[in-house]
Amino acid sequence: MALWCVIMAVSLSVPNMSCDVTGMMSNDPISLSYPSNDGIKPILATTNLSVGERRISFLLTDSTGIVKSETVTLKVKHIERSDSFDDISTARYYDWPYGRGAYTAMINFDEPGYWQMDIYIDDRNQLIPSRLIEWVDRNAMIPDVGSIPPKSLSKTFSDSTDIADITTAANPDTSLYDITVRKALSNQKPSVIAFASPAFCTSPTCGPQVEALSQLKNSYDYDLNFIHVEIYDNPQDIQGDFDAAEVAPAVKEWKLDTLPGWKNESWTFVLDRNGQIRHRFEGFVSSLELEHAVDSVIVN
């Protein structure tokens, strides 16, 4: 079995310390990733973790591209607590478009501090030390699972005669702009709300989230709200001049613009018929993973 050792930090403030855990941490706690000794590199897609049961998502890459395995086993523990023990979890691989993909799992971070995650995969036969450092607050900065989010007046197709005024999508699905977030939270239907800017999706963990949302919508007969909220309020103005970008009011109301690295990433929320958030996804979420979340709110 191969082993990736990934160190993540969950902390309230920047630590003034040097931590030497299995010889892999130094005093540069805000670095995100380090290549392993054989070129395999983990890339953490969920960089905004906080105390509680959280979805983590990560990519594994090598010189040939994405490392793919059906599942990997995770051993997670708090490394500063003497009574901490390994929590064993399984991360499942989900295909993304364009030959990419990521592993996801739910992990219970019961207190802030440094956490160690060892990743085992059965198609390798060597120890591959690597690490990821994570930086977050104790509490979630944005609408969390179990909460009712802001009732934002997001833009709809009726607000403009040109769809390019409300989305940067190249081939927009106009049905994703039928109703506002405010209306969706009050019409007693489950909702899937994606905040994304398709034209400015450039990071390794970004993907065609709006396309995935549209595909998922077309696969359901059940009455659901599917909404895309463009990150920027003036899409047409910024195609040639990104300095002119204005953040959409809904993005500010949901506090997504307060997160590190927020500009290139998407956030997707699945809400029940009462308008309560049941699932929250940072970065790209595949249609299959999103489908599982939607099915859970339909059943309940």
What are these model-predicted stretches?
Residues 195, 221-240:
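Thiol-based oxidoreductase modules, predominantly thioredoxin-like and allied folds used
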Residues 203-220:
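Typically the conserved alpha-helix immediately C-terminal to a functionally engaged Cys/Sec
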Residues 162-167, 173, 181-202:
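Short active-site neighborhood of thiol/selenol oxidoreductases, capturing the structured segment around
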Residues 23-114, 118-164:
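Contiguous segments within soluble domain cores/interaction surfaces
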Residues 15-18:
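C-terminal motif of bacterial Sec signal peptides marking the signal peptidase cleavage site
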